[in-house]
Amino acid sequence: MAIEIGIFHNGASDLKAVTTPNGVVVNDGSLEEVHRSYQRVLVGQVRQGILADRLGYDYWFMTEHHFMPEGPEFSPSPLLTEAAIASQTKRIRFGQMANILPWWHPLRVAEQAAMLDVISGGRLEFGIGRGYQPREAETWGWRYGSTIQDQERNRAYFEEAFEIIMKAWTQPSFSHHGEYWSLPPRHTKWNHKATMAYFNMAKAGRRVEDVLKVGAPDMYSVGSPIMASTTTLKEISVFPQPVQKPHPQVWEPVTSERSIRWAARNKVNAFTVPEPTSRLKRNIEIYYEEAEKNGWPDRLNRGRWKFGWDAEKHRGFGCCRYVHILRPGHEREDLQRYKEPIELQWDYYGPFGFAAVLSDLGEPMYDLNMKVTADLIMQKEIAIVGTADEVVDKIMHIKERGGYDDFMFTAWFEAGGYSTEEIEEQMQVFASEVMPTLRHACGGGPMLLESTSQFVPERGLAGVAGS
């Protein structure tokens, strides 16, 4: 057995949470103060990612969220933030929960994610999602027709974008002509002598006729020689490709059975946050049932993997929970302070339908308009709060109820109103008082390879003043 331990970061504002007269918890600050808060949060995310590596955490996961004055989350570019962390770390692996594919041009996210894999020395865990908040989805997705107000269209767009990214990462050159994307566009004129010279070389590995549809001169065209022809592009190459082959492991945050089954069929690890422990094992069973039915899909074709999580094969169903460790002698005070930030999160999430998934297995679905209290979140074991020993016991209880062989657990420390220093203190206490006990109880941790990437030109700086 083994346990892998990560950190999930959603970027909540560090401004104090306040309960408004109508009972809704929000940021307590002006828009200008929220802007400054998120600047501090961004720097804190980089600091905490570097600290996580030094404390021995295995994974660092970030969300993608935009345009949020209410305060519960901020993470506009997880790939960019993680690239900053990657340049200062050696071991920790970088995931996104998730890159929201309907908000991106698929080749743009393919390039940027591959860049993170290269910069980190092969430490990318590529997370993908569909999005659910209309303020973000309609603002970003309008250009690509990926509205969430038509769920089937959104899903179809997501699946096509995923297919394109996999082609870009695994084929030396490729084309794609689907419902939403034509890549390269069939009308693209490209009569370039350098392209023809390159693909006429045998070592290129592709021929001119593979990548170009060579045509006659266009007597009616004006402009450059590239356009003065009927020669058009047939295929393109995306650079860079990831270091990991055939591609990095892909992840998806899941709640619905349909998403769980799609992930299992498509070699994608599942990741869950807002569901009670009573539902966890059934969702894992659905994932494994679908995987077995489809011949254990895996990017490296390694066959069956252990139930729940397989640390050696890096496959399965990850579990994430809020975690807050109470200080000895300050338990009541710390617990009371923690409740309001949790309700800030859930006053925001609830209206999107997340309240519905809080019901236990076999229990009627909750009213989407219900007030989700911090006490309910703790009762459902979505938030693990207590002394260090109590946190260990609660995490092990979740592992046992989920039926895990190996275990993949991700802790969510940050919450609205907590400073960077307070979040770092939680990380440090967990690493020193919780993590060793979990590692011992679960048979140790993973053997993660260290990056050999070198970003400081030491030879070039020799003798330079201030170096």
Language model features by range: what are they?
Residues 6-33, 150-241, 278-405, 439-467:
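An alpha-helical appendage that flanks or caps ligand/catalytic pockets
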Residues 64, 85, 116, 126, ...:
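Conserved, mostly hydrophobic/aromatic
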Residues 53-54, 82-91, 113, 117-123, ...:
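Acidic (Asp/Glu)-rich catalytic clusters
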Residues 1-88, 247-248, 449-454, 461-466:
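N-terminal beta1-alpha1-beta2 module of alpha/beta enzyme domains
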Residues 59-79, 100, 274-277, 410-423:
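Glycine-rich, proline-tolerant flexible connector loops at the mouths of alpha/beta enzymes
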Residues 255-293:
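A conserved active-site cap/scaffold subdomain adjacent to cofactor or substrate pockets
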Residues 72-96, 157, 427-440:
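Alpha-helix-loop-beta-strand connector modules within alpha/beta enzyme cores
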Residues 3-9, 60-62, 93-96, 124-128, ...:
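Hydrophobic faces of well-ordered beta-strands that scaffold small-molecule active sites
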